[in-house]
């Protein structure tokens, strides 16, 4: 690694909805853009206009009228490697403008997906010729960012949610649980319940508008039934929202009905436990001796935990499930939207971490399987 000392490592958190990327040592990612690759629907329509064969991120978003948009990451797992390569290329050369020496790369991935980690190592070393790389589990990085090494992380993004118990820096794989319910489902649900008010949002462009509404206005009610009563009898929960075309719409109970499905997936015909129960089940799969440490360090992470009121509700629900004398603490760091990336930035900057990198030499010697030996 001596030759790469002079250039800061890159930290890249590949999310279903957004890619967060930047340099180790920074306190926030420099590039945050949608994980989208768009290809022209009709080739030749834009000849002579400098048309590219593919667009990534914000540019794909702004030209979506003439493109077919694809999300290469589904439910946190890469499903299209060619497109993923385009996203990384865009990240390194257009967003972060990495020139001359190739930097070492710390890539953050979802838990429980071994194949992906091998593939990403292969692309990093063989296509991008990085001198060194490391693959870290997203939730573990969020825990580091909160200043802990033991705790349970509920990481909920756009495509998938996970509960990951971590003891002294190591994730406990047998107790990790995955819930295929996250931000995109919440946006879809809000689109659906807005139709009851007569507001129709159907296209992918309109979905972005609803996502924006969700992020600005939705909140989690501490007592759902009581909140519904309040909403029926007064207009205190009503808020107006201006659409891009200037039209103003009003939403009320939808504001807390939308994130309710995180706690009650059955509302959208989904047979799964809510985030509180999934967290509890994860804790119960751990050794009885460490449960107290987990209950006392429940850390929220990811964009879909940004709702106002979610920590209080989570605390209330888990207190109801846990043994009565147990001390429950739910931590919702203000920067949790980016805590995976921040944890990666911290980790890649540590002097003690420098011997953890997988070097190009080690990769050439043992192939992609080295990822499992060194990273997990």
Swiss-Prot record:
InterPro entries: Actin, Actin_CS, ATPase_NBD. SUPFAM superfamilies: Actin-like ATPase domain. Keywords: ATP-binding, Cytoplasm, Cytoskeleton, Hydrolase, Nucleotide-binding. The keyword ATP-binding applies. It comes from the Eukaryota. It is found in: Cytoplasm, Cytoskeleton. It catalyses: ATP + H2O = ADP + phosphate + H(+). It holds the Pfam family Actin. GO terms for cellular component: actin cytoskeleton; cytoplasm. Its EC number is 3.6.4.-. GO terms for molecular function: ATP binding; hydrolase activity. It is an enzyme of class 3 (hydrolase). Belongs to the actin family. There are at least 16 actin genes in soybean. Actins are highly conserved proteins that are involved in various types of cell motility and are ubiquitously expressed in all eukaryotic cells. Essential component of cell cytoskeleton; plays an important role in cytoplasmic streaming, cell shape determination, cell division, organelle movement and extension growth. This is Actin-3. The gene is SAC3.
